[in-house]
Regions:
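Conserved alpha/beta-domain cores
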Residues: 2-188
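Donor-binding and catalytic core of enzymes assembling or modifying cell-surface/extracellular glycoconjugates
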Residues: 191
Length: 191
């Protein structure tokens, strides 16, 4: 449920995060909020920025690259931009040029294109391999059987830095099913 303002929403979300962190006995710095700003105007990003947010997620490469450039021109240079959507091969140059982190690399061809198109003056692009942990055909992500090949490829590329995995679980009310899928993702990461 949404409140009246971005500030109220953020306060509510951070309160929920703090409670979850306390319940799980985790370090409070181990969880970061990623504000999804796709389709939102730059003014809303600025409002969240003024409330202390620095991580923003976008999934429309063209719209995002324009927004990112506008915000940089206004002096918002310390925002960490995450690309969070499916990657179309014809959009890899925009993603490689404007983003800091890509959370949805699922194919070798995409990794190679991001590496080739990352400008030399930028630090390596941090990437997460999107894994299809629910094994649902309608969900994107690398099949578990193909992960080792994709990891090796990414590790061989100079302009990419493998940061971890990302997975989207089944849309289910079964807490057990959700925990099983994400435990599988954690096991892959620990491997």
């Amino acid at each position: 449920q949404f409140m009246n303002s971005i500030t109220e929403n953020l306060n509510h979300i951070h309160s929920s995060i703090d409670s979850a962190v306390d319940n799980c006995k985790r370090d409070e710095n181990s969880v970061k909020l990623l504000c999804v700003s796709k389709t939102k105007p730059k003014e809303m990003v600025i409002e969240a920025y003024n409330d202390g947010e620095r991580h923003f997620g976008e999934s429309y490469a063209v719209e995002a690259s324009e927004k990112i450039e506008q915000l940089k021109e206004l002096g918002y240079n310390d925002i960490v931009w995450h690309f969070i959507g499916p990657i179309q091969k014809n959009k890899t140059k925009l993603i490689a040029t404007h983003f800091d982190i890509v959370e949805s690399v699922d194919r070798v061809i995409v990794a190679k294109r991001l590496d080739e198109q990352r400008p030399d003056n930028l630090k390596p692009l941090e990437v997460l391999i999107q894994v299809n942990i629910s094994d649902e055909s309608q969900k994107s992500g690398c099949a578990i059987a193909d992960i080792d090949e994709l990891i090796k490829e990414i590790q061989s590329l100079k302009k990419l830095k493998l940061r971890g995995f990302m997975g989207i679980g089944k849309d289910t009310d079964s807490r057990e099913e959700i925990q099983k899928e994400f435990a599988q993702l954690k096991n892959l990461f620990d491997k």
